[in-house]
Amino acid sequence: MIKGQLAGLMKQAQAMQDNLKKAQDELANVEVEGQSGAGLVKVVMTCKHDVKRLSIDPSLLADDKDMLEDLVAAAFNDAVRRAEAVSQEKMGKLTAGMPLPPGMKFPF
């Protein structure tokens, strides 16, 4: 009986690993948009943190360089937070609330 339970547990673990890998692959194609300056600066990135596009409203190009740099950084950080939220939501569904060690994040 224990052998059967262990085999079933191993099968479940393999299925979960396969599902997590599939979800990670899907997240590489999911895009999120971060914004700052009321949408004047936008960063589009995947949930794997690959930046796809950066959009800067032309009205900002004549303005203060430091302000523009701050807006780009803020938009990037907003995109990262959104990507992490989408990743956590998708992976959380797969782990069904399984607690993770402190500091461990998905995707691995």
UniProtKB/Swiss-Prot annotation:
SUPFAM superfamilies: YbaB-like. Keywords: Cytoplasm, DNA-binding. Signal peptide: none annotated. One of its GO terms (cellular component) is cytosol. One of its GO terms (molecular function) is DNA binding. It is found in: Cytoplasm, Nucleoid. Its main location: cytoplasm. InterPro entries: YbaB-like_sf, YbaB/EbfC. Pfam families: YbaB_DNA_bd (PF02575). HAMAP family: DNA_YbaB_EbfC. Belongs to the YbaB/EbfC family. Homodimer. Binds to DNA and alters its conformation. May be involved in regulation of gene expression, nucleoid organization and DNA protection. This is Nucleoid-associated protein Lcho_1975. It comes from Leptothrix cholodnii (strain ATCC 51168 / LMG 8142 / SP-6) (Leptothrix discophora (strain SP-6)).
